[in-house]
Amino acid sequence: MTKSMTATRKGIDNTPGAGEIKNLGDVCYEILEPLRAWADKPVIITSGYRSEALCEAIGSKKTSQHAKGQAVDLEINGIPNIKIAYWLQNNVDFDQLIMEYFDPEDPAGGWIHVSYNENGSNRKQVLTFDGKKYTEGLPEMKWKDGEVV
């Protein structure tokens, strides 16, 4: 949840503090473990905790929930991201759920950003980002031969 090639390459300390570690644990317990149990496959975390310095180095905001240990970007091999996003929307408590860089022609493209705020103020905000703009909600799932594509 903390490994970063950018941090390694640039010599950035990406070690979370006690508060961030607690938040990462909450994300694991409330979101990642239920998702792993449903999928019966490993959940691949492409980005977890990011220090403020790392956020700045990659062009993200220092106020990102990643910097607080409250957010992860993820994928699961063999399951379309849209199917994962719909499952998360309907089965876990979350603050923000974003289908990042969604392309309807490539169900494996992009990734899912999901965050959790343990203080009970989760917004349940659902967005889709196509690389240019954010829209509210998730796109409609496409089906072929009884499978989500």
PLM region spans:
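Amphipathic alpha-helical interface surfaces
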Residues: 27-31, 41, 54, 70, ...
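Extracytoplasmic cell-surface/polysaccharide-interacting catalytic and binding patches
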Residues: 1-38, 131-149
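Extended, low-complexity, intrinsically disordered C-terminal regulatory tails
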Residues: 33-60
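Short, flexible, solvent-exposed loop/turn segments with mixed acidic/basic and small polar residues
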Residues: 57-67, 102-105
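Catalytic cores and adjacent binding grooves of peptidoglycan-active enzymes
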Residues: 76-149
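Acidic, His- and aromatic-enriched active-site or binding-groove loops in soluble protein domains
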Residues: 62-82
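Structural recognition of the beta-strand scaffold that forms the well-ordered cores
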Residues: 44-46, 71-75, 113-115
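Glycine-rich, flexible loop/turn motifs
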Residues: 8, 54, 63
